[in-house]
Amino acid sequence: MEFSLLYIHTAILGLISLFLILHFVFWRLKSAKGGSAKNSLPPEAGGAWPIIGHLHLLSGSKLLHITLGSLADKCGPAFIIRLGVRQALVVSDWELAKELFTANDVAISSRPKLLAFESMSYDFAMFGFSPYGAYWRELRKLISVELLSTRRLELLKHIRVSETEISVKELYNLWKDKKNGSGHVLVEMKQWFGDLNLNVILRMVAGKRYFGTIDAKDQEEARRCQKAMSGFFHFTGLFLVADGFPFLRWMDLGGYEKKIKASAKEMDLIAEEWLQEHRRKRESGDVASEQDFMDLMLSLLEDVDLPGYDPDTITKATCINLILGGADTNTVMLTWTLSLLMNHPHILRKAQEELDIQVGKERRVNESDIANLEYLHAIVKETLRLYPASRLGGPREFSEDCTLGGYHVTKGTSLILNLWKLQRDPRIWSNPSEFRPERFLTTHKDLDVKGRYFELIPFGAGRRSCPGTAFGLQMLPFVLANLLHAFDISTDEKTDMTESPGLTTSKATPLDVLISPRLSPNLY
């Protein structure tokens, strides 16, 4: 998660400074008392200011994972930062990560109750933001067994296959219509990846297809959906004044709570329209032979009683969560993968050579081909190592006192796992900042990304690991293989790798590439 420090006006600070100081002193005395009879506390990073702690370090132009990585070089693999009256433990070491996800997995399976999380997730009804407990366990089981199981993904395989075929054909038609004198067309690939992934996940979850249609209603709904999704990722990627100082929430400094609630309401309106449409079809008997996730949720919740929320809220929250996670993460990862290939054309050529050997140029890539593309899988793994979609993993909170690496960690401490730093450990990876897929065919060929090897955990690990890992590991190589097999892709200049802040770390600038077909016209 990226934190953005929102300014506090000097006048307001003057009015509340005395109260803040008293609260700060009380918190420090309480923290000192809590650790006095325990193991030693983790070191605190230097540079903290009175009252606000380290918030000033997190508000500059440097991205948070890089700032925290620099602090780890000074403070060690585990250290504390203070965010107002909150404190967070920053971990940057795979051995400590292993201890976290084995000995302390239950204790770190909850989420901090941040303002944006509360407002955007139906008061924590979304499984991605729910605190650890009976509700989360039952919902996670339902999602894993009924929605994202291997069997369910196999049943819906034709969706990702057909949408990929359609998107490749649209790219080819664009080339036919707009190619330049040298036989290339310039394409912005972030948008292409985004439209493809959103179509796939929307069809799976809500039976919708927004992009590539001429229906004006669908296009308007698509714009609303994209705007609402953009708002979700913007606001959940912020650390607000009210998060660092909960007792100031009533002031709504900067009007952010009002904006967050407006964005959440728009997302809910869209989900409510989907829900009512599905309910009308069920009541009229017009149920499709292929049920999407919303159909399944409506059926499943007739027989399951989840505590704390009504069935409609659970259905909407779960479907939105699946759409947001599935579309955004895959788009971010495909964008970074292609960006890396543009800056390493020799690796791109090797990937295409493998495709020509395993698939040939007389047909298109089938899903059955993917298992044979070892070098392509190595490219995906290396991208996930260097550019995990969420550089700091999902934010967590200790629900009980713990011991980690000999340090005492108090209940209520937030956990920040710096995957960006952890997965570039020079003790594990030679030349850790270099893009070298070959390492996954030689020295690290036995490592996977499913949370079993703590040197490489881009999807997290333990109880709170990403439930969509299997889906992501199907989409990423399949889309990439089809794209590289169908087109020659290049750039006139080096691709900009600037990252943007947020809950997921996307490419800050467009990904403009030149494409031309490499197969016979009848194959598109």
Curated annotation (Swiss-Prot):
Positions contributing to heme binding: 466
Location of the protein in the cell: Membrane
InterPro entries: Cyt_P450, Cyt_P450_CS, Cyt_P450_E_grp-I, Cyt_P450_sf, Plant_Cytochrome_P450_Monoox
Keyword Transmembrane helix attributed: yes
SUPFAM superfamilies for the chain: Cytochrome P450
One cellular component (GO) term of this entry: membrane
Keyword Membrane annotated: yes
Stretches that traverse the bilayer: 6-26
Example GO molecular function: monooxygenase activity
CDD domains: CYP82
Catalysis: reaction(s): strychnine + reduced [NADPH--hemoprotein reductase] + O2 = 10-hydroxystrychnine + oxidized [NADPH--hemoprotein reductase] + H2O + H(+)
Keywords: Heme, Iron, Membrane, Metal-binding, Monooxygenase, Oxidoreductase, Transmembrane, Transmembrane helix
EC category name: oxidoreductase
Functional pathway: Alkaloid biosynthesis
Annotated PROSITE patterns: CYTOCHROME_P450
Pfam families registered for this protein in UniProt: p450
Membrane topology: Single-pass membrane protein
Coiled-coil spans in chain: none
Catalytic activity, EC: 1.14.14.189
Cofactor(s) required for function per UniProt: heme
One GO process term, biological-process aspect: alkaloid biosynthetic process
Function, as annotated: Monooxygenase involved in the biosynthesis of curare monoterpene indole alkaloids (MIAs), natural products such as strychnine, a neurotoxic compound used as a pesticide to control rodents, and its pharmacologically active derivatives, including brucine, used to regulate blood pressure. Curare alkaloids act as animal glycine receptor antagonists. Catalyzes the conversion of strychnine to 10-OH strychnine.
Membership in a protein family: Belongs to the cytochrome P450 family.
Protein name: Strychnine-10-hydroxylase
Organism name: Strychnos nux-vomica
Classification of source organism: Eukaryota, Viridiplantae, Streptophyta, Embryophyta, Tracheophyta
